[in-house]
Amino acid sequence: MMFQQDYPHGFSLVETSLSYEMLDYFQNIVVSNSEDVASQQNSISSSSYSSATLSCSITEQKSHLTEKLSPLRERYGCGDFLSRKRRRRSEKTIVDKENQRMNHIAVERNRRKQMNHFLSILKSMMPLSYSQPNDQASIIEGTISYLKKLEQRLQSLEAQLKATKLNQSPNIFSDFFMFPQYSTATATATATASSSSSSHHHHKRLEVVADVEVTMVERHANIKVLTKTQPRLLFKIINEFNSLGLSTLHLNLTTSKDMSLFTFSVKVEADCQLTPSGNEVANTVHEVVRRVHKER
């Protein structure tokens, strides 16, 4: 197996071997002709040839040398070696340029195909009022306009949400109520009334002004009231409790912003006008708070 190796001046192994063979051939020709010239010079010096005869002899030697070199040129083409090498380089350059041109055309074709695909998807996502024309510039212009409109809408919604959060104060007292009889969160009040002849339940849809939870243990009641802060609200509630026969044993007040949480520990006296039940006391407490708010 013949391996291709790098030789000086860009020649291959085959070309180098041919060159060596040609050099040997040239050397033999030159040596033989040198001997002929030397013999002729000796004969000239001895025979005193004229200069015209010497010139004719040199011409004949050149012609003879050319005739000997002709078969070698026909066999190896040594005269056209450099021209063939240049031609191969030129042909290689032309092929490389053609390949680059074809690659560039293929890349450009794929790029346009992808661009058209993306534009069709973009157009399908736009409203009809923004995607009427079919040219690429109009589709991109409509998309930009639509995105600007969405951005303005988003900023407006964010401003509304921020204003809503500022207006709505978080109810930090929501965990204080387990089973309230009245709750502003549901805005539903359940009132239980008892008559002297029989007991039955009445569900009324009332205006809930406070969260009220009442827990009864015999004749002692734990009352929690969460409502909007109002001047002299605590004083008015205590006076109403006393008039109903509810003695205040302990109380606690906690405020946060515009809300107040009242915690009462009361005793239902014997002369109390209310039935000692959680629902009855809750109804009365809520009615007291609602009446106090109306007196403002």
UniProtKB/Swiss-Prot annotation:
Subunit structure: Homodimer.
Compartments, record wording: Nucleus
Alphabetical keyword list: DNA-binding, Nucleus, Transcription, Transcription regulation
Induction remarks: Repressed by heat treatment.
Listed name of the protein: Transcription factor bHLH99
Domain bHLH, chain residue ranges per copy: 99-150
Subcellular location, principal: nucleus
Tissue specificity of this protein: Expressed constitutively in roots, stems, and flowers.
One cellular-component annotation, GO: nucleus
Sample GO molecular function, one term: DNA binding
Domain of life of the native organism: Eukaryota
InterPro entries recorded: bHLH-TF_ACT-like_plant (IPR054502), bHLH_dom (IPR011598), HLH_DNA-bd_sf (IPR036638)
Gene3D superfamilies noted in UniProt: Helix-loop-helix DNA-binding domain
Any one GO BP annotation for this protein: regulation of DNA-templated transcription
